Regions:
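Short glycine-/small-residue-rich Rossmann-like dinucleotide-binding loops
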Residues: 65-67, 102, 163
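Internal alpha-helical scaffold of NAD(P)-dependent oxidoreductase catalytic cores
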Residues: 114-138, 143-191
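Short, conserved SAM-binding/catalytic segment
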Residues: 26-43
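NAD(P)+-binding Rossmann beta1-loop-alpha1 motif at the extreme N-terminus of oxidoreductases
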Residues: 1-27
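Rossmann-like NAD(P)(H) cofactor-binding subdomain of soluble oxidoreductases
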Residues: 69-142
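A generic structural motif
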Residues: 8-11, 49, 132
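N-terminal Rossmann-like NAD(P) cofactor-binding module of classical short-chain dehydrogenase/reductase
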Residues: 60-62
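Short acidic low-complexity segments
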Residues: 45-58
Length: 191
């Protein structure tokens, strides 16, 4: 969120933690991360970043939630499912949804299925291919604590859409702030 807002894009960060939302809206951060405090403060003061506990209508949605392991060592996709279902009511034709959470192969398609079930009035790549109303992609976030701002901007990113159009749209979005290369592929390969 901060990386996009630092490029003067309107961003609404969504978190279920009301304390984190309040902290961000004061222009402060709730984690320790070099340079992030300055970027958030400037973005909030400039009117480019705000936080909310509920999703709002947007052109693009990035889902970055935990994907812990269950007791049987299987990934727990409950947070991804919850996030997808929370944005579904505010999705509109032309929206782009990108999953950034570390996820197993097939997770992006599963997320698209949850969205399709919640919004039968919209078409998704698994149904409509290139003509989908909503584009879906996967772009794993890979950063080291203490270097988040530098790595978000400088690192190469693997971006995989469910269709070539989805990949192109996701790549164009990340190029707003990314100085590294966008390595474009499909969602399963990116996962």
């Amino acid at each position: 969120a901060a990386a996009f807002a630092s490029r003067r894009k309107q961003v609404v960060g969504v978190d279920i933690n009301a304390r984190a939302v309040e902290t961000i809206n004061r222009g402060e951060i709730h984690i320790v991360e070099p340079d992030l405090d300055r970027v958030v403060k400037e973005a909030v003061e400039g009117g480019f970043l705000r936080a909310s506990t509920t999703p709002v209508e947007a052109d693009a949605y990035l889902i970055a939630v935990p994907t812990p392991f269950k007791g049987d060592h299987e990934p727990d996709m409950a947070f991804v499912e919850s996030a997808a279902k929370s944005i579904a009511p505010v999705l509109k034709k032309g929206a782009l949804v990108i999953l950034e959470s570390t996820s197993p192969v097939g997770a992006t398609e599963q997320m698209a299925q949850w969205l399709a079930e919640a919004r039968p009035d919209l078409s998704f790549p698994q149904q409509a291919g290139e003509q989908a109303d909503v584009n879906i992609a996967y772009c794993p976030e890979r950063v080291l604590p203490g270097q988040v701002m530098v790595e978000l901007i400088k690192n190469d990113r693997v971006i995989g859409g469910m269709t070539p159009v989805c990949s192109e749209r996701a790549s164009a979005l990340y190029k707003i702030f990314l100085e590294g290369e966008c390595v474009v592929t499909n969602s399963r390969t990116a996962e």
